[in-house]
């Protein structure tokens, strides 16, 4: 009976044939690297201030430029996923932040670091939305909620990993070595390019668009009109946007400055500070 039901449901059958487990493996790893790369600034901020003689305003601007780049990357990544493909954007975004963050280890000025960091964060922001979109389309419905929840732990695990690595690398080898390690995710980008296909749903939608056919479920020309025309949808969109913005403001604001504050203002040794941050990220990971 079960096999007959699957055979009668082409979309379910197609979803099960897609290598979603392999896709999850790669998406989890690239999100781990994403979380680690976002967190790397917090643990190198004190070293950057010392080497380049930065003021608190300049140091804070590094975090602001990073978040600005991620915001633009998130918006652009959503559009690019629909136009160019989910896997393709993940590959490009991973390669972008990996290469540019890696070259940040060679910078000789504050301005060079800001420029590389901003462009790298375009990739970091795009990656978050692209991995979620890909897995939403590839994973069978009965596993989707669990898989997406597990996927999100990769981001927090990345923060935990960079905390542990920082405690070992920075006191001995310096902050530049930590950035050089971010060249490693380029290997994931190359592997995904050859091993993970685009989801079947995107291929079909793309084929329809290229052939000029109209889908009865096609989105309206202006998708934002569907949100703002309906008062209930409009209110929900505004409230969720505000709550999400405030949440990210608090999270990244604390994450960027807390390590530096613990080390410089409270006089906590770097390794002890890293241990404290590791406990914070570990708690977050289990909460997810």
Give each language-model segment a name.
Residues 53, 85, 106-112, 140:
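Helix-breaking motifs and short loop linkers at transmembrane-helix boundaries and internal kinks
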Residues 41-42, 231-288:
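Extracytoplasmic gate region of multi-pass secondary transporters
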Residues 1-36:
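Cytosolic juxtamembrane N-terminal segment immediately preceding the first transmembrane helix
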Residues 151, 155-194:
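Helix-loop-helix hairpin linking two adjacent transmembrane segments in secondary transporters
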Residues 116-153:
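Cytoplasmic helix-loop-helix junction between adjacent transmembrane helices
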Residues 22-56, 254-259:
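Extracytoplasmic
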Residues 47, 75-79, 83, 168:
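Membrane-interface helix termini in secondary transporters
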Residues 88-102:
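Structural signature of the two symmetry-related core transmembrane helices
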